[in-house]
Amino acid sequence: MLENKILLLGLGFLGEEICNEALKRNYDVVKTRLHKSDGIIQLDINNHSKVKNLIESQKPEIVINCISRNDIDNLEKNPKLATDVNVTGPKIIAEACEKIGSKLIHISTDSVFDGKNGMYSEDKKPNPINIYARSKLDGENEIKKMCKNYVIVRTNFFGINKFGKYLLNDILTKLKNNEKIQGFKDVIFTPLSTKNLSQQIMDVSFSDYRGILNLSANKPISKLEFCNILANKLNFKNFNIIEESIDNFNFIAKRPKNTSLDNSLSKSIVKHKSVDFEEWLNFSTMEIIQHFNLENNQK
């Protein structure tokens, strides 16, 4: 096993930010992605022998697994897709990590809870209500069985990214085009920015902590509040945010309402404090304006 070497599985939205944070700290990072890309190892999580061989040949001190299927409605119709990537994949990774003594950091989700109560601590019993969430919980359980040295990170996140299909991008695109935005007043979460989350993931990677860990914001926020705070902070004058209840929508997969997490335990483990959404906006406004070409909106 090679000290200070990280194998990062899944260089996507969160993975890229983790990579940046690891490089800032002078770690050696080996990266994988599903599709071919220069300087990045092409890896399909369903190619089990290649996954095992990669981990065993690289001998990293830390393996960070960001690979996941989270297209919730599609997975509800195609549960095998969820099982292959979110259950069997983590099992194979955990087996290989255990064999060579690598520490596994696995990115899970706040959606393992049914959303009836909120502010869930690590010891609360999960109760997934859709195929995606069930597969993520099953993946957690496979890791627990296969591997001793692991951290399962339950979280939710947002950020500025080039992939264009995530919460912040979706809201800002609609605000810019003056499109209607459905703001759910009863969908509540505790998201971290990808940058803040990556800092905390790196903190815990080289800590002595083992087990499940919530990495989340301090205060819950509804999707409606999230939208309104963003629109007001960026000086949108004529935005069309409609207050809605998720009860009025018939998604293919059920959605939990309040998946907010209690991050009390993490405060004694990570060095970087959790930054709530509104505080994050205070020092990220200019980056958002430039990334989304909102300069005219500021006049």
Residue ranges: model-predicted function:
Residues 84, 88-92, 112-153, 159, ...:
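Catalytic helix-loop patch of NAD(P)-dependent Rossmann-fold dehydrogenases
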Residues 200, 207-252, 257, 292-297:
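Mid/C-terminal beta-alpha module of Rossmann-like enzyme folds, strongest
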Residues 183-188, 213-221, 269:
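Glycine-rich Rossmann NAD(P)(H)-binding loop
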Residues 45-85:
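NAD(P)H-binding glycine-rich loop region in Rossmannoid oxidoreductase-like domains
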Residues 141-189, 195-196, 202-203:
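NAD(P)-dependent short-chain dehydrogenase/reductase
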Residues 276-299:
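Amphipathic terminal alpha-helices
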Residues 34-48:
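Rossmann-fold cofactor-recognition segment
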Residues 77-105:
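NAD(P)-cofactor binding segment of oxidoreductase domains
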